[in-house]
């Protein structure tokens, strides 16, 4: 059975004090969540160490939002996978469209990051997704297949999460129809050699649409942006009712 993973991506939000306040409000709200659901918070680097200490032994896992592919070296501003595992981090988001758009990341560099993450014992969450222009041009399938194949070269698919995040739905409120997200995620699954890989949907997931999204047979979780910043809304997503 594929693991259900609900992950929040805080992006560049929350100071350490704000993160601690979030956890105080959030943890009691998910005490009764199904044990089969993995809950992950992917937070800024500055929040990781303090949150790791507060969450130690609990059910919420921590993830980073990026990682470099080299183990060490003259890479100013970068973080290695070993630095993350040392403080108890389990997951790392790789290849998010914002990293691709603003920082020039590619399928090839995403692949290097995935390999480095796995080598260090982290679970990579590889993001793929098409732009509005690509969808309008009928290129969704080709774009997604290319991203998946290039991102997974030599990757161990037993230690992997994929997130389908159509770029046009991220932070716009314009959610991809649940059935269409299910179709594309089914296409992604066809490219894999391991049928048990967890594939999430991301893109304006919120408390109002999560039940319909999670009712789809191919969707194994959600990568949640803005709705993960508030304890009540993210707890409602974790406690979805498909």
From Swiss-Prot:
This is Triosephosphate isomerase. Belongs to the triosephosphate isomerase family. It comes from Synechocystis sp. (strain ATCC 27184 / PCC 6803 / Kazusa). It catalyses: D-glyceraldehyde 3-phosphate = dihydroxyacetone phosphate. It comes from the Bacteria. Involved in the gluconeogenesis. Catalyzes stereospecifically the conversion of dihydroxyacetone phosphate (DHAP) to D-glyceraldehyde-3-phosphate (G3P). The active site is at 96 (electrophile), 165 (proton acceptor). GO terms for cellular component: cytosol. Homodimer. GO terms for biological process: gluconeogenesis; glyceraldehyde-3-phosphate biosynthetic process; glycerol catabolic process; glycolytic process. It is found in: Cytoplasm. Its EC number is 5.3.1.1. Transmembrane segments: none annotated. It is an enzyme of class 5 (isomerase). NCBIfam families: tim. InterPro entries: Aldolase_TIM, TIM_sf, TrioseP_Isoase_bac/euk, Triosephosphate_isomerase, Triosephosphate_isomerase_AS. CDD domains: TIM. Pathway: Carbohydrate biosynthesis; gluconeogenesis; Carbohydrate degradation; glycolysis; D-glyceraldehyde 3-phosphate from glycerone phosphate: step 1/1. Keywords: Cytoplasm, Gluconeogenesis, Glycolysis, Isomerase. It holds the Pfam family TIM. Substrate binds at residues 9-11, 171, 204, 225-226. One of its GO terms (molecular function) is triose-phosphate isomerase activity. The keyword Cytoplasm applies.
């Amino acid at each position: 059975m594929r693991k259900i993973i609900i992950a929040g991506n805080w992006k560049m939000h929350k100071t350490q004090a704000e993160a601690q306040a979030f956890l105080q409000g959030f943890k009691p709200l998910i005490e009764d969540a199904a044990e089969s659901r993995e809950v992950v918070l992917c937070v800024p680097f500055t929040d990781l160490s303090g949150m790791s200490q507060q969450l130690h032994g609990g059910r919420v896992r921590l993830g980073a939002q990026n990682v470099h592919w080299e183990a060490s070296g003259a890479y100013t501003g970068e973080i290695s996978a070993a630095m993350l595992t040392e403080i108890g981090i389990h997951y790392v988001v790789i290849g998010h469209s914002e990293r691709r758009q603003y920082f020039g990341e590619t399928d090839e560099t995403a692949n290097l990051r995935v390999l480095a993450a796995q080598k260090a014992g982290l679970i990579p969450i590889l993001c793929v997704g098409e732009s509005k222009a690509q969808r309008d041009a009928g290129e969704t399938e080709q774009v997604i297949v290319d991203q998946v194949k290039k991102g997974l070269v030599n990757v161990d698919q037993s230690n992997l999460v994929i997130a389908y995040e159509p770029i046009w739905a991220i932070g716009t409120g314009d959610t991809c129809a649940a059935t269409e997200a299910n179709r594309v995620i089914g296409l992604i699954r066809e490219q894999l050699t391991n049928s048990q890989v967890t594939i999430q949907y991301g893109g304006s997931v919120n408390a109002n649409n999560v039940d319909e999204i999670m009712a789809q047979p191919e969707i194994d979780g959600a990568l949640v942006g803005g709705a993960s910043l508030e304890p009540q809304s993210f707890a409602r997503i974790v406690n979805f009712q498909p």
